[in-house]
Regions:
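Glycosyltransferase catalytic domains, chiefly GT-A lineage
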Residues: 2-343
């Protein structure tokens, strides 16, 4: 896959750089090891980053069936060694019933009125994030997505009716969100993001709006959503509403480095090896080579097998990056058939 180039307008001049914080979520299980990869890649790819890297950690409580905190003390120590701050937060709305909600409630772990960029933990930083010219007054989010929601039923409401019902519910202007270059009832006409990254000038304001919309949709969905599943899509349904309500929208070309040469939302290592360019693989294997990293993350079996036992390279040899299947599900099926899907 050829990655989008950020172009000459991507890098901000030093005097124009804005200091900002980064938020990821860290918790017991897979995400604690992914957090190590994120932190290590940030330090290698952008050693000049001078903001705070905050790992939001959900705390045990009535919303969690089991303790969600980072369970490996070596992971906790390594994250701190990599300059991350582990900050607790309480789960009041979601928890184990909808762990994707951590990215919403975790915003409360950030200091108020300080610009932030949220990343899903399964992301690698592959370039100088500190030089991306964010306009923190105009929030945006990742466009690296497929038409995963809504799923249109044969005799049910269409895209327009479904999305308009959501904007109407919260008193938002629907028409202004449409991409009129796309045909009516084609999914890309409607404002829809991958929630793998997003940003704004204040995490509290963003988090409160995001939480209000997400819980409102969950607890009392508009009528046209009656046949729609909101698990796991709730965050991606509420996100465009929150961004639009705060004066944001689709990201401009100045942000092309995100999901381009500056960051990679890899999601599953099998997919990374299958479709990402050589630079991403090189960054992954470089940041996982030091013994202090290796001895910790190899405890997670998929990382051990994919990175250190060569299974990832076997996946990579299966595909031509210049001629990948058009849909991700086709990639997944081929990888699973080869018994190389690990997460």
């Amino acid at each position: 896959m050829k990655r989008r180039q950020a172009g000459s307008g991507m890098a901000a001049k030093g005097k124009d750089r804005q200091k900002f914080n980064i938020l990821i979520v860290g918790q017991n299980g897979r995400l604690q090891y992914e957090a190590v990869l994120f932190a290590a890649s940030l330090r290698q790819s952008d050693p000049g980053f001078d903001g705070r890297l905050i790992v939001a950690e959900p705390q045990p409580g009535e919303k969690w069936a089991r303790d969600p905190r980072i369970g490996n003390p070596e992971v906790r120590a390594l994250l701190k060694q990599l300059g991350a701050e582990i900050v607790p937060f309480e789960s009041r709305a979601f928890g184990s019933a909808y762990p994707h909600g951590n990215k919403i409630e975790g915003l409360s772990a950030l200091p108020e009125a300080e610009p932030f960029v949220f990343f899903d933990t399964d992301t690698l930083i592959t370039g100088k994030l500190s030089e991306v010219p964010f306009d923190f007054d105009r929030p945006a989010a990742s466009m690296r997505r497929e038409g995963s929601w809504p799923e249109i039923e044969l005799y049910g409401p269409g895209y327009g009716e479904i999305w308009k019902s959501l904007y109407d519910r919260f008193g938002l202007a629907y028409q202004a969100t449409l991409d009129l270059s796309q045909p009516d009832e084609y999914w890309q006409r409607y404002l829809y993001f991958n929630a793998g990254w997003f940003f704004y000038r204040c995490p509290r304001a963003f988090g409160e709006r995001f939480l209000s919309y997400a819980t409102g949709i969950r607890d009392d969905p508009p009528g046209p959503l009656v046949c729609q599943s909101l698990d796991p899509w709730l965050d991606q349904v509420a996100l465009p509403l929150a961004i639009h309500s705060l004066g944001g929208g689709r990201p401009g070309p100045e942000l092309a480095g995100l999901d381009g040469e500056v960051s990679c939302h890899w999601r599953v290592l099998s997919l990374l090896y299958a479709r990402e360019d050589d630079h991403v693989v090189d960054v992954l294997e470089a940041v996982t080579a030091p013994n202090k990293i290796k001895k910790v993350i190899k405890e997670y079996e998929p990382f051990k097998r994919m990175i250190y036992q060569g299974k990832g390279r076997k996946v990579r040899a299966m595909f031509d990056r210049a001629d990948l299947p058009p849909r991700e599900q086709m990639l997944r099926n081929q990888i699973k058939k080869a018994n190389l899907w690990m997460r």
